[in-house]
């Protein structure tokens, strides 16, 4: 029994799950921007709370003043439960928080990655650290700000020398949690915070619609530092090669900046034509092209230092600073829609009541269903095994899966009601069957689905060695479900082995449609979402994604069945950076296997870096590899052992 416990118990922490490290005093390498406060102040319930906390209720306190840091998506001021992150403006590896520097070192990225792919690493860190409300912004050379003034007569950037700090204005601040998302702990800390002294200037303006903060000049950019290292190199032969490579990088960097500048000019020209009375000024030329969507804007108002959350850091106590407006979170293209059918939806929040009437059943669900056992917890609710106790219903004494879905925020209301809409519309043997849905209370929905005994594909892949015939069977069944979605311009966007169920009949079914999206109107979107190891390269790089993003995730699932584990499973950060930089290295991963040429070709067509080169679900269903699929009776041989392993893992 002890051996069984050790096998199914908690696994040893990997590099991504190391204990949080104490933050060192390296704040001079970055600039810190605290989240903008809401005008609605909220008092602390716990007097022992830390001076700055962003725990359960999204309430942050600075210097004895408590602010509600919840940011609303809609203009009417309703909040969505989203908490603004703390922004760190950095220009090189040394500007990262100590936790993140150590994380990157533990990931053992190849030499030079932190220089050549630094902006990609920032995008990955922002995604993995989103639950700790940490967000990095790449800022290039400060000279670019002055260059913008010379090249754009309409842009007036305020350059303000900051005043010396009076001792009476200093406020000591405790450290802000700095752990790694899911895999690096949630604590951090001590008093060695990157923000050691916070200044709250006096509020002298009545306009609180925009929030301004101050940022100090960043250090030299990565190309300048690289050039210094090359010049100090004593090896003349390698120095010449490195200088040539550096020159190519500079040309690429210049081309990117010129292209970005042209796009901005075209966008500004279009905005002026559409809204002649508005002239927003963007400073994204000082930021990474991949982070262009953060929509920073320059301000020429000297009162920006008197804004509610204007903060000064130890790095800009004296010298030159400039002000920007705090960035807003990028919205999903379907943020104002609740799905009904492809191309049709309810407007949210205006038609929320109509959506409730359309998607939900009347009555109290507790009169019909009884909770039995907890099964799983996901990003959009908790799933329980339940039993129908109404003898006159269509599901008499039937075991069902009951998903409890919170609707406390606008985001929860839209996403969870949309998931109900998607499942209610779907009708396919490879997709979990929707039964009914109820509103349990003002804070919770109950969705009833068919109960799938057995386990997930993740359980199966980690406990059994799949032969190619069984892999082909699973791949064919998943693709049939995907093909049904894609033919209706619907993408799953969270396809992973944990969202593929195997029931006691050997049937394969897709579950969890919380991130599902209808591409009938817009054909693509720019957003990063899903599970780290399964996210496509176009998502990580901030490029438009569409239906083909599911094909990449499907290819990772197939590779996981072959290897028995995810590629680069020891580090999510490393896996995502490799995917984003076209360095998955499929031939190397397959070199340790005895896979056939057909299977290798099948995987290669799924895991193409360029999404336009990936085969579609319909094309993959015609691939010769799938002709190897075993009959369902042969696949059912693994079910008893799979069911037992799933039961034991739930026990311990």
Swiss-Prot record:
<feature type="region of interest" description="Disordered">
    <location>
        <begin position="163"/>
        <end position="198"/>
    </location>
</feature>
<feature type="region of interest" description="Disordered">
    <location>
        <begin position="257"/>
        <end position="289"/>
    </location>
</feature>
<feature type="compositionally biased region" description="Low complexity">
    <location>
        <begin position="257"/>
        <end position="271"/>
    </location>
</feature>
<feature type="compositionally biased region" description="Polar residues">
    <location>
        <begin position="279"/>
        <end position="289"/>
    </location>
</feature>
<feature type="binding site">
    <location>
        <begin position="375"/>
        <end position="383"/>
    </location>
    <ligand>
        <name>ATP</name>
    </ligand>
</feature>
<keyword id="KW-0479">Metal-binding</keyword>
<feature type="active site" description="Proton acceptor">
    <location>
        <position position="494"/>
    </location>
</feature>
<feature type="coiled-coil region">
    <location>
        <begin position="231"/>
        <end position="275"/>
    </location>
</feature>
<comment type="similarity">
    <text>Belongs to the protein kinase superfamily. STE Ser/Thr protein kinase family. STE20 subfamily.</text>
</comment>
<dbReference type="InterPro" id="IPR008271">
    <property type="entry name" value="Ser/Thr_kinase_AS"/>
</dbReference>
<dbReference type="GO" id="GO:0005524">
    <property type="term" value="F:ATP binding"/>
</dbReference>
<dbReference type="GO" id="GO:0004674">
    <property type="term" value="F:protein serine/threonine kinase activity"/>
</dbReference>
<dbReference type="GO" id="GO:0046872">
    <property type="term" value="F:metal ion binding"/>
</dbReference>
<feature type="binding site">
    <location>
        <position position="403"/>
    </location>
    <ligand>
        <name>ATP</name>
    </ligand>
</feature>
<dbReference type="InterPro" id="IPR051931">
    <property type="entry name" value="PAK3-like"/>
</dbReference>
<dbReference type="InterPro" id="IPR000719">
    <property type="entry name" value="Prot_kinase_dom"/>
</dbReference>
<keyword id="KW-0460">Magnesium</keyword>
<keyword id="KW-0418">Kinase</keyword>
<keyword id="KW-0175">Coiled coil</keyword>
<protein>
    <recommendedName>
        <fullName>Probable serine/threonine-protein kinase mkcD</fullName>
        <ecNumber>2.7.11.1</ecNumber>
    </recommendedName>
</protein>
<feature type="domain" description="Protein kinase">
    <location>
        <begin position="369"/>
        <end position="626"/>
    </location>
</feature>
<feature type="compositionally biased region" description="Gly residues">
    <location>
        <begin position="182"/>
        <end position="191"/>
    </location>
</feature>
<dbReference type="GO" id="GO:0005737">
    <property type="term" value="C:cytoplasm"/>
</dbReference>
<feature type="region of interest" description="Disordered">
    <location>
        <begin position="1"/>
        <end position="47"/>
    </location>
</feature>
<keyword id="KW-0547">Nucleotide-binding</keyword>
<keyword id="KW-0067">ATP-binding</keyword>
<dbReference type="InterPro" id="IPR011009">
    <property type="entry name" value="Kinase-like_dom_sf"/>
</dbReference>
<dbReference type="GO" id="GO:0106310">
    <property type="term" value="F:protein serine kinase activity"/>
</dbReference>
<keyword id="KW-0723">Serine/threonine-protein kinase</keyword>
<keyword id="KW-0808">Transferase</keyword>
<dbReference type="Pfam" id="PF00069">
    <property type="entry name" value="Pkinase"/>
</dbReference>
């Amino acid at each position: 029994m002890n051996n069984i416990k050790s096998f199914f118990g908690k696994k040893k922490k990997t590099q991504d799950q190391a204990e949080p490290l104490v933050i060192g005093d390296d704040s001079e390498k970055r600039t810190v921007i605290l989240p903008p406060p809401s005008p609605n102040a909220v008092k602390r319930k716990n007097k022992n709370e830390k001076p700055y906390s962003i725990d359960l209720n999204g309430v942050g306190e600075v210097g004895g003043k408590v602010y509600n840091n919840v940011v609303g998506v809609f203009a009417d001021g309703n909040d969505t439960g989203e908490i603004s992150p703390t922004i760190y403006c950095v220009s090189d590896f040394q500007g990262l928080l100590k936790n993140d520097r150590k994380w990157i070192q533990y990931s053992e990225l190849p030499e030079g990655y932190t220089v050549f792919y630094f902006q990609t690493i920032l995008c990955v860190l922002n995604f993995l650290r989103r639950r700790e409300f940490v967000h990095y912004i790449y800022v290039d050379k400060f000279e670019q700000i002055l260059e913008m003034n010379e090249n754009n007569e309409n842009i007036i950037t305020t350059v303000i020398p900051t005043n010396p700090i009076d001792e009476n204005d200093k406020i000591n601040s405790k450290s802000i949690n700095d752990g790694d998302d899911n895999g690096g702990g949630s604590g951090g800390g001590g008093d060695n915070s990157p923000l050691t002294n916070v200044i709250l200037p006096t509020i002298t303006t009545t306009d609180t619609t925009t929030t301004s903060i101050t940022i100090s000049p960043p250090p030299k950019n990565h190309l300048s530092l690289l050039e210094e290292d090359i010049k100090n190199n004593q090896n003349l032969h390698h120095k010449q090669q490195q200088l040539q490579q550096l020159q190519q990088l500079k040309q690429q960097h210049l081309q990117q900046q010129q292209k970005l500048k042209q796009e901005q000019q075209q966008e500004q020209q279009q905005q002026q034509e559409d809204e002649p009375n508005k002239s927003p000024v963007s400073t994204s030329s000082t930021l990474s092209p991949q982070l262009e969507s953060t929509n920073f804007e320059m301000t020429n108002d000297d009162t920006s230092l008197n804004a509610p959350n204007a903060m000064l850091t130890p790095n800009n106590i004296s010298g030159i600073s400039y002000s920007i407006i705090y960035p807003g979170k990028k919205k999903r293209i379907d943020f104002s829609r609740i799905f009904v059918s492809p191309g049709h939806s309810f407007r949210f929040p205006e038609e929320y009541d109509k959506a409730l009437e359309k998607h939900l059943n009347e009555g109290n669900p507790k009169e019909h269903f009884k909770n039995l056992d907890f099964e799983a917890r996901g990003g959009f609710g908790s799933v329980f095994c339940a039993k129908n106790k109404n003898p006159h219903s269509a599901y008499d004494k039937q075991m069902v899966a009951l998903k409890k879905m919170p609707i406390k925020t606008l985001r929860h209301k839209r996403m969870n009601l949309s998931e109900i809409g998607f499942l209610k519309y779907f009708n396919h043997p490879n997709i979990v069957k929707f039964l009914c849905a109820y509103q349990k209370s003002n804070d919770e929905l109950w969705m009833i689905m068919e109960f799938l005994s057995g386990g997930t594909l993740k359980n199966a892949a980690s406990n059994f060695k799949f032969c190619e015939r069984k892999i082909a069977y699973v791949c064919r069944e998943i693709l049939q479900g995907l093909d049904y979605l894609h033919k209706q311009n619907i993408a799953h966007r969270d396809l992973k082995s944990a969202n593929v169920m195997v029931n006691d009949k050997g049937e394969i079914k897709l579950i969890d449609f919380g991130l599902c999206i209808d591409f009938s109107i817009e054909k693509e979107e720019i957003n990063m979402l899903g599970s780290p190891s399964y996210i496509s390269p176009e998502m990580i790089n901030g490029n438009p994604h569409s239906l083909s993003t599911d094909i990449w995730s499907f290819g990772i699932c197939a590779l996981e069945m072959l290897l028995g584990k995810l590629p680069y499973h020891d580090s999510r950060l490393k896996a995502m950076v490799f995917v984003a930089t076209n360095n998955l290295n499929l031939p190397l991963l397959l070199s340790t296997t005895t896979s056939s040429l057909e299977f290798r070709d099948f995987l290669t067509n799924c895991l193409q870096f360029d999404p336009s080169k990936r085969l579609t679900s319909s094309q993959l269903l015609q691939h010769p590899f799938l002709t190897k699929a075993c009959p369902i009776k042969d696949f059912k041989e693994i079910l008893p052992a799979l069911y037992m392993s799933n039961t034991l893992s739930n026990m311990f």
